[in-house]
């Protein structure tokens, strides 16, 4: 899911054969031998960006577009309490990967693997709630932290989940998510929904992003 984890030979194969053939045939060829270590190193860097902005004393985390959910392992270590994790993503592998921003984003996930990975890394199984984004979403807990890294607002409109967020989040909930810089050139639309927002990180790439922290979700519009 992350291009940063591709080896040089994989990048060459993707350019040579195209994204569709690469994704379905060649993606496991010439893979980095230490891919697991690199994945954790990548999300450790993500955690270091977030850690100074994380709220205190929370019980429930919602991760939208969780993928393998690795960031939640670092969040569990950060809080070191009996947190509950609600993980939303599509639960299928589509034939064609779409890069960048798309109204109908694609999926490359097996949520069973997500739950297995987290439970193997000191998160209790009973605290992992896997939610298929294509099905009805029911969350009976109050969420105090919402994260969405390179998903909501980056690959598809963040407004997609606003009705859910207004329903399940606390009044003091913290939201951390990525915005596609080319799509959201200013923050006027965000200011209609959040009382406070701040850019905490920017990434320049083919698909640049701004990571924002928001609070004060306005629920009556």
Task: For each feature predicted by the language model, list its residue ranges.
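A short glycine-rich, Lys/Arg-flanked "PGG" loop and its adjoining helix->strand segment in the class I
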Residues: 159-171
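Conserved class I S-adenosyl-L-methionine
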Residues: 58-67
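A short acidic, Gly/Pro-enriched loop at the edge of an enzyme's catalytic core
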Residues: 135-146
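S-adenosyl-L-methionine
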Residues: 102-136
């Amino acid at each position: 899911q992350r291009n940063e984890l591709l080896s040089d030979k994989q990048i060459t194969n993707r350019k040579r054969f195209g994204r569709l053939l690469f994704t379905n045939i060649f993606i496991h060829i010439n893979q980095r031998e230490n891919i697991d270590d690199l994945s954790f190193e990548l999300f450790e860097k993500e955690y270091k960006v977030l850690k100074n902005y994380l709220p205190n004393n929370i019980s429930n985390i919602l991760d939208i577009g969780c993928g393998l959910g690795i960031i939640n392992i670092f969040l569990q270590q950060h809080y070191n309490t009996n947190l509950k994790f609600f993980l939303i993503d599509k639960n299928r592998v589509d034939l064609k990967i779409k890069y960048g921003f798309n109204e109908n984003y694609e999926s490359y996930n097996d949520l069973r693997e997500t739950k297995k990975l987290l439970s193997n890394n000191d998160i209790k199984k009973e605290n992992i709630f896997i939610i298929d984004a294509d099905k009805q979403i029911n969350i009976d807990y109050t969420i105090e932290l919402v994260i969405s890294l390179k998903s909501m607002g980056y690959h598809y409109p963040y407004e997609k989940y606003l009705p859910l967020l207004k329903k399940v989040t606390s009044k003091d909930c913290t939201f951390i998510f990525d915005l596609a810089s080319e799509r959201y050139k200013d923050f006027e639309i965000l200011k209609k929904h959040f009382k406070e927002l701040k850019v905490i990180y920017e990434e320049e790439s083919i698909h640049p992003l701004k990571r924002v922290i928001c609070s004060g979700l306005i629920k009556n519009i």
